[in-house]
Amino acid sequence: MNMETSHAKLFSLLFILLNSAWSIASSSISESFVQCLSSHIQNSNSSNGIILTRTSSAYPSVLDSSIQNLRFSNNSTPKPEAIITPFDESHVQAAVICSKKNGLQIRTRSGGHDYEGLSYVSISPFIIIDLFNLRSIDVDIENESAWVKSGATLGEVYYSIAQKSKVYGFPAGTCPTIGVGGHISGGGIGTIFRKYGLASDNVIDARIVDVNGRILDRNSMGEELFWAIRGGGGSSFGVILAWKLRLVPVPPAVTVCHITKTKEQGATKLLLKWQNIADKLPEELFIRPVIGSGDKTITVPCFLARLRNFSI
């Protein structure tokens, strides 16, 4: 019994020592990173508003602000050494350079709609670059394009386009709070993709910070990297700062309807029939079945015109 007690105490002591050593090493890395970043942000009015460490009062609220999967907001989830909230592209460059220098992983977050936690969790020491301050949108109707920074949401993009024109749009998703940085770099499916393709198909330029802290556009990054960031996950190759989008023509009025069916009302047969004729439907027609845990299946068709123009 004494031997077992001694072993238990020994293991407890070893655990405490290892945990203390890890905490000291983590603190040292964090301090070194903050010092490096502060030295690179000399032209900023206040680096304190850009760099949030674990001792910062705003750290918890900013960290949790766009975690969409609450399983990653518990105490056992690894937390970043620091959160960087850049106001300028140069701040992103500095964060990349200093994280590389200190051996820290980078997690880039724009809207946080990442249910696997890939934009805010890592098992290795890491920082989060949260782009919510980089959200400007410049719509150019004359040239049918728009420069959109990665921290903007889809809702903000749609609203900005609509403020300039009622007959232009952009083919992306339906959730207004999704950040364009991650949405487009992952492909981006929306209600008009049958006619115009994915969101990533309608990107004509981009700005990215690479691993060496350089800002590259389409010309300087090359076509292979430009191809990869449009669907291959932008954060796999750098930090996406902004996208240049191709705007597409849309009618001033569209037709949207909801069809609700239970299994007993023939929902399964309806879905089967849709699958059999889907490839024959006009490309202006988008149909999305929503199958929930309740009794009803909801089918949501959207037609890019008035209903009188619809024919098969």
Per-region residue spans from a language model:
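N-terminal accessory segments
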Residues: 2-196, 202, 215-216, 237-239, ...
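A glycine-rich, basic-preceded beta-loop-alpha segment at the flavin cofactor/substrate interface
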Residues: 209, 214-250
